[in-house]
Amino acid sequence: MNIAFLSSSNPNDQNNWSGTLYSLYTSLQKKHRVIWVGETVFAEVWEFHKANFKNNETFFPENYALLFGKLFSDLLKKECYDVIICRDYFFAAYLVSDIPLIYIGDTTFHLFNQYMNWQDKSLTKLAEQLESLAIQKVDKIIYCSEWAKQSAMQDYNADAEKIEVVEFGANITENIPIPDNVSPINAPCNLLFIGRNWNMKGGNKVLEIYHNLKGRGFQCTLTIVGSEPPMSLPNDPNIEIYPFIDKTNSNDRLKFHEILTRSHFLILPTRFDCFGIVFCEACAYGIPSLM
């Protein structure tokens, strides 16, 4: 099939959306012709916004949903596609096409805003309207959880018949063997924290847990991946920090593999996660997760 792929994020970049876009995009490419339609459109609209508003107004793609709808509707007419897969509700809301349209997501705006609590009421109202338009317009919706599905039905009156729940995976590209090692009983317990948003993912709580264990005489280490503590930490040889691991880089992927291989527990007292790909990654390595 010829598949049009609409996404504001680059589906070729493994760092976007925890690698789910990349896994979806490349998996489809194995058997179909998949085109990232209008890959420059989002960037061009962003540049237009910056040129006109400088730094006086934050860029929110929701404000350009009508423009996105017009641009993508025109682009889709230039080639014969069998299906459209859309990642962003602000792309789908005003899209005009006879081609079957699939919307894929991990949450609804209603659920998202329960945690993020946007203060701009007019923007919140607009986002709710766009989400509703997208949900009603599309032919099929794929969510990764019953949680998101229930919200779509209850908060946006979505038709249950057109929603499918497909759980996402770990998005690990290499088939790297995991050593079957059993740590000695007196070996340190290696704790792992993975998260880009230190506060939302509970980074301070993880440090508290680590220091509490050390204070009780437990031998342990802590590896922090994806962010840095906002405060300066006393020098501790048992804490390793990797602010960013680039999954498009083979050396970084191997480093990520090495970190997961030697970890005993993932600790992630997160306050907000739509699905939690990191838990899938931990499961792939047989690592118990503590929330």
Language model: regions and residue ranges:
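Conserved donor-binding/catalytic core segment of Leloir-type glycosyltransferases
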Residues: 179-201, 206-212, 222-223
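Carbohydrate-associated surface elements
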Residues: 147, 169
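Nucleotide-activated donor-binding/catalytic signature segment of Leloir-type glycosyltransferases, i.e.
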Residues: 228-265
